[in-house]
Amino acid sequence: MSEQKTLSVQKRDNLGKGANRRLRSEEVVPGVFYDTKGNNVAVQMPAKPLQKLFEEVGRTTVFQLEIEEEGKKSTHPVLIWDALFHPYKKKFTHIDFFGVDLDREIKIRVPLEFVGTSRGVKLGGKLEVYREFIDVMSKPLTLPKKITLDLTELDINSTIMLKDVAMPEGVRPATNENFAILSVLTPKSE
């Protein structure tokens, strides 16, 4: 397994809308770290290292959050839990980090990646996607970044159900419900 990435942040004392606006004008992103015991710490970090880390780890890869407070540093394994972006500048406006216990399963939403063109679509069928994400249970270090589904063998009137999805080792669906992920539908007649 590759070494985990680290993001350095500082504890933030000035809270509120005005303080957060001042931070953002200085290319600093406000955020909150929620630890495994339910406590939270207001933090701030430079925007560029955060953007770079987010591009590398996304929302399903554990990394180390190094919090500096009054000259002392503490490190915590975390996931990015929620991220808010400016509507058109594609810049972070706020971010939440979720501390994880590496030995306990967590529930997280993982994106699905669809590859290949199905036989049914080549014959004129219509691909209807019902889910682009699925919720899974896994220990934090075995979370997949995405789950890939190969569509090449799907014929017209075929459906991929949750039970048909091959999960990576150590990963299971977060629900017992069996729902449709996608279907190749019969083409409509003119």
From Swiss-Prot:
A biological process (GO) of this protein is: translation
Q: Name one GO molecular function term.
A: 5S rRNA binding
Keywords, ordered alphabetically: Ribonucleoprotein, Ribosomal protein, RNA-binding, rRNA-binding
Sorted alphabetically, the Gene Ontology cellular component annotations on this record are: cytosolic large ribosomal subunit
- What Pfam families does the database record attribute to this sequence? Ribosomal_L25p (PF01386), Ribosomal_TL5_C (PF14693)
Q: Where is this region: Disordered?
A: 1-20
CDD domains the record matches: Ribosomal_L25_TL5_CTC
InterPro entries in the record, alphabetically?
Answer: Rbsml_bL25/Gln-tRNA_synth_N, Ribosomal_bL25/Gln-tRNA_synth, Ribosomal_bL25_b-dom, Ribosomal_bL25_C, Ribosomal_bL25_long, Ribosomal_L25_dom, Ribosomal_uL5_bac-type
Q: Which domain of life is it from?
A: Bacteria
Q: How does it assemble?
A: Part of the 50S ribosomal subunit; part of the 5S rRNA/L5/L18/L25 subcomplex. Contacts the 5S rRNA. Binds to the 5S rRNA independently of L5 and L18.
Q: What does this protein do?
A: This is one of the proteins that binds to the 5S RNA in the ribosome where it forms part of the central protuberance.
Q: Which family does it belong to?
A: Belongs to the bacterial ribosomal protein bL25 family. CTC subfamily.
Q: What is this protein called?
A: Large ribosomal subunit protein bL25
